[in-house]
């Protein structure tokens, strides 16, 4: 089993289905005897440039431990799923479980807004 970091962008009109999409991919990992070490939903964010005529997308980060066959299955699913705008799979040397810099920034913004109310 190897460690991977996956970032994928979901169509912005699917706000109610984000959790089911995340659940779908985590289920694929766990059914293949893999482990999910980290799940982060970064929310709806502005894209740096239009992708498929869209200017916003929901970003999701997964850190997983799976076999190469499962990664190929996930990659194929990302490519054939019309709701996934873009995806990137990167192999890592170890399991990453701490919050990403993006998630830390989101949490700081939420705390800042909570204290200003």
Curated annotation (Swiss-Prot):
GO terms for molecular function: small ribosomal subunit rRNA binding; structural constituent of ribosome. InterPro entries: Ribosomal_bS6 (IPR000529), Ribosomal_bS6_sf (IPR035980), Ribosomal_S6_plastid/chlpt (IPR020814), Transl_elong_EF1B/ribsomal_bS6 (IPR014717). The keyword Zinc does not apply. It comes from Blochmanniella pennsylvanica (strain BPEN). GO terms for cellular component: cytosolic small ribosomal subunit. Binds together with bS18 to 16S ribosomal RNA. GO terms for biological process: translation. Belongs to the bacterial ribosomal protein bS6 family. It holds the Pfam family Ribosomal_S6. Keywords: Ribonucleoprotein, Ribosomal protein, RNA-binding, rRNA-binding. Gene3D superfamilies: 3.30.70.60. The gene is rpsF. Coiled coil: none annotated. The keyword rRNA-binding applies. HAMAP family: Ribosomal_bS6. This is Small ribosomal subunit protein bS6.
